């Protein structure tokens, strides 16, 4: 079968190793190139080496890593009322709460010393510095004829580094002229930001089936090396939808449309390393053209 037009000269650019799998499982085998941004994370000293082992064994023939270090910004924005700034999502009081509760994949005992050593200003500065580093690293890789797949503007489940990567690539799209595509994952946490990208009319999109066997094979590779960052009970959706990503957020419309969303819920962990998710695999979860905003 011939490749879909959007998969010609195609590249997935994902923030963290396993993002390429979680949000692009239907196209992962068929894209021409995969680029992953981050390896090391100060709160998880082992994870960089583990990720490098996965990349070395990755079954796709063209996977590279930028080898950047995570900023630690995950969970640092107020997702009940997210504010976009030049670097991504504005970090704020949630930074304090995240450090005190050990919100991003770590227990209190292991995260707090590392975070306290650096401090809240360090996380903000690292997040801001990464914006420029991403621009410099990605600009020479991109051409006008490319189809670039990356995180959606709300960061799927509300991840600050996902939003930042989208905004970097959105700026480079305006500069270089490639097509920028996003997939359709969203959560209760990210919905306030996602709704700012709804439009007056639904746009065109492409729907593709998820290769669940291939996805699980790759998930097992991450699990083998101890760097699978997602819940063990995650269940793949049957399909994914892709559309060209909108640029500007706006105030939510009275009647807004986007495209079918793969909606799932996420609760903040209390004592577990992993985030708890509940996949809404019903028709309401995967086939709404507009969420609770249209009849």
PLM region descriptions:
Residues 1-143:
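Active-site rim/loop-helix segments in enzyme catalytic domains that contact anionic ligands
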Residues 18, 148, 161:
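Divalent metal-coordination and catalytic microenvironments
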Residues 31-32, 57-65, 170-182, 202:
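Structural alpha-beta junctions
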Residues 46-47, 158-163:
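Short, solvent-exposed loop/turn segments at secondary-structure boundaries
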Residues 48-57, 169, 193-199:
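Short, aromatic/basic amphipathic alpha-helical patches
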Residues 97-111, 117, 175-295:
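The feature marks non-catalytic terminal segments
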Residues 150-155, 159-160, 184-185:
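Short, well-ordered beta-to-alpha junction loops that form the rim of enzyme active sites
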Residues 162-170:
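Charged helix-capping and loop-helix junction motifs
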């Amino acid at each position: 079968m011939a490749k879909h037009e959007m998969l010609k000269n195609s590249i997935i650019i994902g923030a963290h190793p396993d993002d390429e799998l979680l949000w692009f499982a239907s196209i992962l085998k068929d894209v021409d190139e995969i680029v992953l941004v981050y390896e090391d994370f100060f709160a998880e000293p082992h994870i960089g080496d583990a990720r490098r082992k996965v990349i070395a064994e990755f079954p796709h023939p063209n996977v590279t890593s930028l080898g950047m270090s995570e900023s630690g910004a995950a969970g640092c924005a107020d997702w009940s009322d997210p504010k976009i700034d030049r670097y991504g999502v504005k970090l704020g009081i949630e930074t304090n709460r995240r450090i005190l509760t050990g919100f991003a994949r770590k227990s209190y005992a292991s995260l707090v010393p590392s975070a306290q050593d650096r401090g809240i200003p360090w996380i903000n500065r690292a997040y801001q510095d990464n914006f420029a580093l991403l621009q410099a690293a990605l600009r020479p890789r991109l051409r006008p004829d490319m189809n670039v797949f990356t995180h959606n503007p709300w960061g799927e489940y509300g991840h600050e580094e996902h939003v930042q990567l989208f905004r970097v690539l959105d700026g480079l799209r305006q500069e270089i002229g490639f097509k920028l595509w996003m997939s359709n994952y969203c959560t209760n946490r990210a919905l306030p930001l996602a709704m700012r990208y709804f439009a007056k009319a639904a746009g065109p999109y492409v729907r593709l089936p998820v290769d669940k066997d291939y996805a699980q094979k790759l998930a097992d590779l991450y699990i083998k090396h101890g760097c699978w960052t997602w819940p063990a009970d995650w269940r793949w959706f049957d399909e994914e939808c892709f559309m060209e990503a909108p640029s500007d957020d706006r105030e939510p419309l009275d009647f807004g449309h986007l495209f079918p969303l793969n909606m799932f819920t996420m609760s903040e962990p209390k004592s577990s390393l992993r985030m708890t998710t509940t996949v809404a695999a019903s028709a309401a979860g995967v086939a709404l053209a507009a969420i609770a905003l249209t009849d």
